[in-house]
Amino acid sequence: MEIKPITTYTGKVVPLFNDNIDTDQIIPKVHLKRISKSGFGPFAFDEWRYLDDGSDNPDFNPNKPEYKDASILITGENFGCGSSREHAAWAIKDYGFDIIIAGSYSDIFYMNCTKNAMLPIVLDKEAREYLADAGEITIDLPNQTVSTKDKSFDFQIDETWKKKLVNGLDDIDITLQFEDAIKNYEAAKTY
């Protein structure tokens, strides 16, 4: 999968201000029947997104017309908690979200986001509420800011994850940067 670099990103936001959204709520286990990264978007938030008859739930924010085509999810605390299934990150990415802004994340879910070309940002509740009302926001990853037309918020990110996302690199790309050193090490080994 080619990873598109994230430097400056402008997108529409959708709020989903629940705390403790776990991976089973993101992608119910009944839908974990494949190992490819695509095809999970229709099942993301399945139990909230659809009514019992299979139609869209009009009360689920991402289904509302004003949030159509939103690519930035703003949510609560402890997002992605629960089991460590990478399918949860795949489902959110396949749903159409490139950026998630939460109060906190499960460590494993956070890492799974970065491995799947999504930027997980941590901001406090006041900032998230402000951004949720903005409609459209801009993320500047190199400068680590999230902005509206009239206000800006700083965020922190580990330099390793930042480098990968800014440069569109995955774990294999990072490993290949050390290919010569790996070959030299292997050549020097006496078995």
Curated annotation (Swiss-Prot):
Q: Which UniProt keywords apply?
A: Amino-acid biosynthesis, Branched-chain amino acid biosynthesis, Leucine biosynthesis, Lyase
EC number(s): the record gives 4.2.1.33
Q: A single GO CC term, please?
A: 3-isopropylmalate dehydratase complex
Mind telling me which SUPFAM superfamilies this protein's record contains?
A: LeuD/IlvD-like
Q: What pairs make up the disulfide bonds?
A: none
Question: Which GO terms of type biological process are on file?
Answer: L-leucine biosynthetic process
Q: Superkingdom of this entry's organism? A: Bacteria
**InterPro entries associated with the record:** 3-IsopropMal_deHydase_ssu, Aconitase/3IPM_dehydase_swvl, AconitaseA/IPMdHydase_ssu_swvl, IPMI_Swivel, LeuD
Gene3D superfamilies from the xrefs? Aconitase, domain 4
Please list the reactions this protein catalyses: (2R,3S)-3-isopropylmalate = (2S)-2-isopropylmalate
Q: In which pathway does it act?
A: Amino-acid biosynthesis; L-leucine biosynthesis; L-leucine from 3-methyl-2-oxobutanoate: step 2/4
Q: Which GO terms label this protein's molecular function in UniProt?
A: 3-isopropylmalate dehydratase activity
* Complex formation: Heterodimer of LeuC and LeuD.
Q: Say what the protein does.
A: Catalyzes the isomerization between 2-isopropylmalate and 3-isopropylmalate, via the formation of 2-isopropylmaleate.
In the record, the note on similarity to other proteins reads: Belongs to the LeuD family. LeuD type 1 subfamily.
Q: What name is this protein filed under?
A: 3-isopropylmalate dehydratase small subunit
Task: Provide the species name.
Answer: Staphylococcus saprophyticus subsp. saprophyticus (strain ATCC 15305 / DSM 20229 / NCIMB 8711 / NCTC 7292 / S-41)
